A protein has these predicted regions:
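A short, Trp-centered hydrophobic/proline-enriched beta-strand micro-motif
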Residues: 121-129
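Short glycine/proline-enriched turns and hinge-like loops at secondary-structure junctions
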Residues: 68-69, 137-139, 163-168, 182-185, ...
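Short Ser/Thr-interspersed hydrophobic loop/turn segments at strand-loop and sheet-helix junctions
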Residues: 53, 76-81, 174, 191-195, ...
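Cytochrome P450 C-terminal beta-domain/meander region
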Residues: 137-155, 349-353
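Flexible, small-/acidic-enriched active-site or ligand-binding loops
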Residues: 140-142, 194-224
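A short core secondary-structure module
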Residues: 151, 155-201
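Alpha-helical interface subdomain recognition
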Residues: 1-83, 87, 93-94, 105-110, ...
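A short, charged helix-loop
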Residues: 214-241
């Protein structure tokens, strides 16, 4: 195991050791191959994590959880993703994002219902924001929710909703009023995917096949007003804090996945011989491995900095999370490209996991705000944009 974190606290080290033991029992190369080839959600691994109490990490102690800090959650996601990017992404998308939204926006009744369900049952919560006509301009959403009596009637379409096909509830950003800027009049609803008028369709994709990206169609879906999450017309301000958390944790996931790539390359470079010596002893190959190690260390440092600021509640956390995501995700993409080069023709075959990393990595550079969006956020923080 290369590039482990030398600055872990004793509590964090215990988290890493516990996850390593669980993942070593439940995740192997065959499972990862099957999840990819069959486009199958890792139900068994996620159930094992839930049974072991790991779903409770992002839930406050007051609601049956562990109340983990952002620093600890970043450590958990790095370790999970070192074993399996799909499992790390599922853990983040289905448990952390949902818990964060309910903690921040939910009523007492909603918190009392959903937070214990996440903590003890591993309830799966999807988050639907992006629409076909908005893309990176996520605030330009058109899915609308009209108030009729004591209900909302929802009409519209979402796209690239992670895990919607397996979710117990879908937190959905909707437009509840017009007027003012596009950032105003936005609310969030907790929508039961089993309601009449909800249609979920999986989107075929090139990578990260073990967790679905979905289109979600809402055709006059009647949603009780008690499912309003947060204040009515809270606007983009109700959505934005969740995006900062998403960017931080996607960076942590990228660090873990990069560590797996480096481990695979180190093993291959030390066992394969070319021109009468180990592959890794060739200067050009060694240089690639060194660059991977440097990328891991710098990315992790940025993650730690951003996580510290999140825990402090510092307003600069949003910008630092964007910096961490920009650097870590593009470093992961670069590492996988070099990994395929190191493996040569073998890296181009499905038999070797670096090819899976090559297909998976691009999602992290796009999801949670593309790299170009992160640059805009960072430029704005530097006073370069209005």
């Amino acid at each position: 195991m290369s590039a482990s974190d030398p600055l872990l606290t004793q509590d964090q080290l215990a988290l890493v050791e516990g996850l390593d033991a669980l993942c070593s029992r439940h995740i192997d190369d065959k499972l990862l191959f099957d999840l990819d080839q069959q486009a199958r959600y890792p139900f068994d691994v996620m159930q094992a994590l839930s049974d072991g109490g790991w779903a409770s990490m992002a839930v406050p102690e007051s609601h049956g959880g562990a109340g983990a800090s952002a620093r600890d959650m970043a450590v958990v996601l790095e370790e999970l993703s070192r074993h399996s990017l799909v499992v790390g992404q599922a853990y983040f998308s289905m448990w952390i994002l949902g818990a964060e939204a309910v903690i921040r926006l939910g009523t007492n009744s909603q918190a009392n219902e959903w937070l214990p369900r996440i903590a003890t049952e591993g309830a799966r919560v999807a988050f639907a924001l992006t629409e076909p006509g908005s893309g990176s301009d996520a605030a330009a959403l058109t899915t609308r929710a009209e108030k009729r009596g004591s209900d909302y009637v929802v009409t519209g379409q979402k796209v690239f909703t992670t895990g919607a096909a397996v979710a117990d509830v879908i937190i959905t950003a909707v437009r509840t009023s017009r007027g003012g800027t596009k950032h105003a009049g936005i609310s969030t609803l907790m929508i039961d995917p089993q309601l009449q008028g909800v249609d979920i369709r999986k989107i075929p994709k090139m990578g990260l096949k073990g967790i679905d990206l979905c289109e979600v169609f809402f055709d006059d879906v009647v949603v009780p007003e008690t499912c309003l999450l947060g204040e009515l017309d809270a606007g983009w301000a109700g959505v934005l804090p969740g995006l900062a958390i998403e960017r931080l944790y996607l960076a942590a996931i990228s660090v873990g996945a990069m560590r797996d790539v480096l481990d695979l390359c180190l093993e291959h470079a030390s066992t394969r011989e070319t021109f009468g010596k180990a592959l890794g002893s060739h200067q050009m190959i060694a240089e690639k491995l060194v660059e991977m190690r440097v990328a891991i260390e710098t990315s992790r440092a940025l993650v730690k900095q951003a996580a510290e600021m999140v825990d402090r509640g510092d307003g600069e956390a949003v910008n630092l999370a964007s910096i961490a995501k920009l650097h870590a995700t593009r470093s992961y993409v670069s590492a996988t490209r070099e990994a395929v080069q190191i493996f040569g023709g073998y890296g181009f075959t499905d038999e070797y996991p670096v090819s899976r990393h090559y297909r998976d990595c691009k999602y992290l550079e796009i999801g949670g705000g593309a790299s170009e969006i992160q640059k805009i956020v960072i430029a704005r923080s530097m006073g370069l944009r209005p």
